[in-house]
Amino acid sequence: AEMAVRASLTGHKVYSTIHTRDPREVYFRLEDMKVEKYLIRDSLVGIVSQRLIRLLCDNCKTIIDEKNIDGKVIKLYEKCGCNECNFTGYKGRSLVAAIHVIDNEMKEKIKNINNDNSLLSNLEMIKNLKALLINGNISLLDYENFIEVEGLSFEFKKESKL
């Protein structure tokens, strides 16, 4: 890990995959790998956090409720099952992602990452997930399960309330 960080500091582009539950853990994982904090801050230029979620089959999804979300009445769907989706209720997947650009301002903020849970959070992923729900691409149950399975902290659950 330290060799990759040092290579990035000499101008080489280094891409790596670190499997973590959220972008904050990337920073802490590099610390656990004995990379100095100042080297982490100086070498990171971005973190992409991504997950896949199953999409409801447009052919058979069923309306179960209507709710007022952000001033708009939206239809909530649940999976059903048909020949087109092989009776699963799902057809295809969508990417739910967040991109964190580590600019000079963020590098300064990262110095206090232990005291600020909002830094490098998955909140952007929740906003993207909410858009899929509002557009009728996923069910409310899948939305809630995603939040639960991803282990998002309480603050982000509050933000995601419908």
Where are these regions (language model features)?
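Short, flexible helix-loop junctions that flank or precede catalytic/ligand sites
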Residues: 1-162
